[in-house]
């Protein structure tokens, strides 16, 4: 099962466009046009839900095409937008897909994965809601094993208090738990047949459902370990699986966001080379058309409509142009947003301003060793200078260049911090120059190191 980042739901769908942009500004520097476009798209979802009658179903999202080099914030804008609204979010590269009928991933797997994320999100929220009851039931099962089902209420209460206080954490008990060993051999994937691909199915689950029972096995475990196994088991019993699946499908259909990166790589150009490659790229585009326009995809949880899922496509378009995409696909991505290349000022802001800026992250990491890092303004400026220089001379990877530069800059400190006697280190422009100047001036070396 895929893990998803889950938080308690907040009603952020009603945020105004300006409020959405302000939220995005907390984490992302610049790119105001892109922020404005996604803010309007999100607000329109809220507006659509307030429209009454049949007209609501006719209002479809205006999908977005983001144009910009790598590292300028395309993915981060979409990801933060989804996190802001607790929407199911799925990112995939267009180059991962092959045309239906060829070996490889088909585009419908996008929706299957999106629904899987939505199910995991809803399930995690449901488990939070039943956590207290699940813990109570788990403790009762442990007490049954510890003192027996027929023990007096006084005895059970006495041992319950010890379990809750952690006094018996290292006591070994014998307890019956669910047997998660696959029956008949693990999972398999239905072959790629157009319209019939349902995703990964677990053969053991299918047999278990058919027999109408679940296997258990008796294990010897410490009480503290048993709690981590039994609480999830009891949570599963308390939550309504059918209700979760229905809520997840509804969430994916109405609030889902799909981010398709590198869409320029499947655009056909006159310089594309092999004819077979052109046909394959065009085939993937044609497969994407019904998905973006609105269709029904069969998943293991049931049919999912894609009519109201927001699709955000992006690409650098250094070689291909947006007009090289199929005209039909261009029409399904009506909102075009061009993201700006990052300047030196942008790099400085990225280092300092976001709530989770890189400088704050590295300072916090080294701070756990009780070593305080202090960056001077001149050091920040020098780091930004080097990032721009390497991007221009080697390859432009945008803000991602800052990660490689800071890793090299702080490599020795990171290695020695746990044994340092000095508790404060000032990073100034001279320190930056001493650490990085040899690499920056040797561009052949910079290609490999930075």
From Swiss-Prot:
It comes from Rickettsia typhi (strain ATCC VR-144 / Wilmington). The keyword Coiled coil does not apply. Keywords: ATP-binding, Chaperone, Cytoplasm, Nucleotide-binding. ATPase subunit of a proteasome-like degradation complex; this subunit has chaperone activity. The binding of ATP and its subsequent hydrolysis by HslU are essential for unfolding of protein substrates subsequently hydrolyzed by HslV. HslU recognizes the N-terminal part of its protein substrates and unfolds these before they are guided to HslV for hydrolysis. GO terms for molecular function: ATP binding; ATP hydrolysis activity; DNA binding; peptidase activity; proteasome-activating activity. This is ATP-dependent protease ATPase subunit HslU. Belongs to the ClpX chaperone family. HslU subfamily. One of its GO terms (biological process) is protein unfolding. It is found in: Cytoplasm. It holds the Pfam family AAA_2. ATP binds at residues 29, 71-76, 261, 328, 400. A double ring-shaped homohexamer of HslV is capped on each side by a ring-shaped HslU homohexamer. The assembly of the HslU/HslV complex is dependent on binding of ATP. The keyword Nucleotide-binding applies. GO terms for cellular component: HslUV protease complex. InterPro entries: AAA+_ATPase, ATP-dep_Clp_protease_ClpX, ATPase_AAA_core, Clp_ATPase_C, HslU, MCM_dom, P-loop_NTPase.
